[in-house]
Amino acid sequence: MKTNEFDFDLPDRLIAQTPLEKRDHSRLMVLDKNKQEIVHKHFYDITDYLNPGDCLVINNTRVLPARLFGVKENTGGKMEFLLLKRIDLNTWEVLVKPGKKAKIGSRFEFGEGILKAEVLSMADEGARIVRFEYEGVFEELLDQLGKMPLPPYITEELADRERYQTVYSKHEGSSAAPTAGLHFTPELLSEIKKKGINVVSITLHVGLGTFRPVKVDSLENHEMHAEYYEITEEAAQVINDTKKAGNRVFAVGTTSCRTLESASTEKGKIEANKGWTNIFIFPGYQFKILDGLITNFHLPESTLIMLVSALLGKEKTLQAYKVAVDEQYRFFSFGDAMLIV
């Protein structure tokens, strides 16, 4: 299957630059895997499509303010760090701009020296392994000095950094938000639970690979980035009980979907687990757990639209995207949502 089969025309004006004032007032396109019709709703209508006994799986990761701006020691040259992955307490894999100034042994400082860093080694795709030096708690310094790592297609400054977090975010570790979850409010979640729908939390720390384009012509040759995930015994039990009872499991976002499918057995059960996954889901994949998906509208030729196509079918997905463009849906991280039942 070719990468360019997932291309489509998207006007720049449809790329949402800011979140809506009310999270759940985004539009919702509803699609049935077994029908051709497309229904246009708002996100707060989502309870109409969930039944008592269904299970909603949310990703409770929290985005780190992972962009650091500092200077190179001795020269004072301006530098930007983007934290990618924690290796141990003080050691991280980071992207550095400009990279040519970040040779092994180079030292940098942030916040007038309250945080320092030294390049230890080179990593894949131009990244560096860096050791940080500081007093106190690293996360508190990051909260003080760091900025949110917004996707490259968002060019406007974010007024409130909490709008790039889900209301249920808990465990810090992501370089990007699980954006399907941005539409939920505490009130909407309460309404969903009152209807008898189980809401289960899993964790997958989203990496920047989410935004990396597929650079190969054939999907079979694409290698996904690895991301860390955790599913507790309690979460696995609720999901397995849902399937056993003949009810549906909905993933909130592609990250929740990939976590579920990574932790599934051939017999269609979820096992409690923690580890790294690089699962790549594209048309032809047989889902073992997932029955439905809540997701945003994604980039052309991205692994995310390929995952949606695996569930909905490629032609149906591209047709839905054409309708979304014609109806002027808002796209990408701060955009509107799609529900597949």
Swiss-Prot record:
- Which SUPFAM superfamilies does the UniProt entry name for this protein? QueA-like
Q: Which Gene3D superfamilies match?
A: QueA-like
A Gene Ontology molecular function term for this protein is: S-adenosylmethionine:tRNA ribosyltransferase-isomerase activity
Which GO annotations describe the biological process of this protein? Answer: queuosine biosynthetic process; tRNA wobble guanine modification
Please report a single Pfam family linked to this protein: Queuosine_synth
Database matches in InterPro entries: QueA, QueA_dom1, QueA_dom2, QueA_sf
Hydrolase keyword on record: no
What is this protein called in UniProt?
S-adenosylmethionine:tRNA ribosyltransferase-isomerase
Gene for this chain: queA
